[in-house]
A protein has these predicted regions:
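Conserved donor NDP-sugar-binding/catalytic core segment of glycosyltransferases
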Residues: 63-93
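Acidic donor-binding segment of Leloir-type glycosyltransferases
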Residues: 1-28
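Short aromatic/hydrophobic "clamp" motif used to bind/position activated sugar donors
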Residues: 51
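Glycine-rich, basic loop-to-helix element that forms the pyrophosphate-binding segment
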Residues: 29-46
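Acidic donor-binding loop at a coil-to-helix junction in glycosyltransferase catalytic cores
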Residues: 141-147, 154
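Non-catalytic, C-terminal membrane-associated alpha-helical segments of glycosyltransferases
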Residues: 183-187, 201-270
Length: 270
């Protein structure tokens, strides 16, 4: 559970919203430690036909809701995926993530098994939850893909990509945060493999890691460094390979060490 003054911050936000004629409801989910359980709590408390999802580390742009909701004018649409851009950061890793377009929904929508959108920017029609259930509350990662895949494979609801419905995401600023992020991505791979049989990424060996790092030092860095010195490309491009390698190593480790807990197979219902 949060210990960073979240309740106090929300109480202050509630008062400010009330002064502007808006309503904010502070809901608490403290029985199950997962973001998906928290989302289920909010879904049950909601009364609207369209539910919009974003994350605490995201900043929706003006007109986000209107652009996200617009495709639902088509009664056949059950799922709308908005785009995720980087919130401009100061650290090297934040700038790297922005340069790599990390977390763009275009990547997840191109998933070879089935398209999906991340809950950082997602709209779902309430009727969908009545048909296929809520998020798996005991999943700790991969629940957004699971939800979208259940919609895509078990229903006739259409998915629409609303590229102009934008949120900005605050990327990881430290090595520790980056490691945690990519380990979690690896666990997600494993969980979705156990639920759907999707392919796992191949295991990353230290021998391959040494080879790729050596290749970067001897071949890629001299070329990319010269290009950066000449002002043709950003310096970030010159150091992207070792960061990519670090991410891949941690994703592989997360996948290798994970196993889907039995309770995580449970689907809650409205």
């Amino acid at each position: 559970n949060s210990s960073d003054r979240t309740p106090n911050i929300l109480a202050s936000a509630q008062k400010e919203a009330e002064s502007q004629g808006l309503t904010i409801r502070h809901l608490t989910e403290n029985k199950i430690q997962s973001s998906y359980a928290a989302r289920n709590t909010a879904i049950r408390a909601s009364t609207g036909e369209i539910l919009a999802f974003t994350d605490a580390d995201c900043r929706p742009l003006p007109q986000w809701i209107s652009h996200l909701v617009q495709p639902f004018a088509d009664p056949a649409v059950g799922l709308v995926v908005g785009e995720i851009n980087a919130l401009p950061g100061e650290t090297l890793l934040e700038k790297y993530a922005e340069r790599q377009s990390m977390m763009t929904q275009k990547d997840t929508l191109a998933h070879p098994f089935c398209p999906y959108g991340q809950t950082a920017n997602l709209g779902i029609r309430r009727q969908v939850f009545a048909e296929i259930g809520l998020f798996r509350p005991y999943m700790t990662t991969g629940g957004d893909a699971d939800m979208c895949w259940r919609i895509g494979r078990e229903t006739a609801w259409k998915l629409v990509f609303a590229e102009t419905a934008l949120v900005q995401h605050r990327h990881r600023a430290t090595i520790a945060e980056l490691k945690s992020q990519w380990r979690r991505y690896g666990r997600s791979n494993r969980y979705l493999h156990e639920l759907y049989g999707v392919d796992l990424m191949r295991d990353f060996t230290w021998k391959e890691s040494v080879y790729r790092l050596s290749r970067w030092l001897l071949k890629e860095l001299p070329v990319a460094g010269a290009s950066a010195i000449a002002g043709k490309t950003p310096w970030l491009d010159a150091i992207a390979s070792p960061i990519n390698l670090y991410c891949a190593i941690n994703r592989s480790a997360g996948q290798r060490e994970a196993k889907l807990p039995e309770p995580a197979k449970t689907i809650e219902w409205l």
